[in-house]
């Protein structure tokens, strides 16, 4: 509690970005930071710190991957203005073809302002905010579960790694914190793995469970802001970064 009796909560999230970092160490690690920060401020919490826990191999390629991953983590955190307060790094030959990149973030939020990733009322609106949708990260979630063949990184694999825009993320962060403080929304969800498709399904699923209802949602793909012409199926599963789905009243 604060001096005036206001109750606060700490938000903590941690996730891995292993395969993307192996394929493209700079963007893979940077987007890992971006994703974990969005997990924090979609709850209405302001991120106050980042930590990273790294495991890399000992061969020449692994050292190059490590150096670029650290640069990506540092760049994204510095641009957004959230300090990296610690972590650890170890090397071992067992990580030569499978580095481990775990990123953790901490945030703080007033208890009364916590936002959950759900839709609770009929006729609520799903509002898309943030970056335009592109072909970045198509099949990224599936790629993260695959095994590399002969340790080769193909152009197709590289296209599965998302591109980062930390300056846009900073704008999203501030907007979401303001939304939280003013209690303007019913729910909010980051568009992470699986993109718009998974984000909308998760929002509806949680809403159904909380309200014991059979609610669903309609998505108008022709209204989604896109960078260029895209197939509707790709719009649904794109993992372009810095995008959110907000649940609000009209």
What does each model-identified segment do?
Residues 1-250:
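Glycine/proline-enriched, intrinsically flexible loops and inter-domain linkers
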């Amino acid at each position: 509690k604060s001096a005036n009796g206001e109750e606060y909560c700490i938000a903590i999230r941690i996730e891995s970005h292993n395969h993307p970092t192996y394929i493209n160490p700079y963007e893979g690690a940077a987007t890992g930071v971006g994703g974990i920060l969005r997990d924090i401020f979609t709850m209405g919490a302001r991120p106050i710190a980042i930590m990273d826990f790294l495991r890399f191999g000992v061969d020449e390629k692994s050292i190059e991957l490590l150096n670029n991953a650290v640069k990506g983590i540092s760049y994204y955190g510095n641009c957004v203005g959230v300090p990296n307060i610690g972590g650890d790094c170890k090397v071992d030959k067992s990580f030569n073809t499978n580095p481990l990149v775990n990123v953790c973030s901490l945030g703080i939020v007033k208890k009364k302002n916590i936002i959950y990733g759900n839709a609770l009322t009929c006729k609520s609106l799903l509002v898309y905010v943030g970056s335009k949708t592109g072909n970045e990260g198509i099949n990224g979630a599936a790629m993260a579960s695959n095994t590399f063949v002969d340790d080769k990184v193909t152009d197709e694999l590289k296209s599965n790694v998302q591109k980062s825009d930390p300056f846009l993320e900073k704008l999203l962060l501030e907007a979401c914190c303001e939304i939280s403080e003013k209690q303007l929304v019913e729910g909010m969800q980051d568009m992470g793995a699986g993109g718009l498709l998974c984000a909308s399904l998760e929002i509806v699923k949680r809403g159904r469970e909380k309200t014991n209802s059979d609610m669903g949602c309609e998505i108008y793909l022709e209204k989604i802001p896109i960078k260029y012409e895209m197939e509707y199926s790709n719009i649904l599963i794109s993992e372009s970064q810095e995008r959110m789905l907000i649940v609000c009243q009209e």
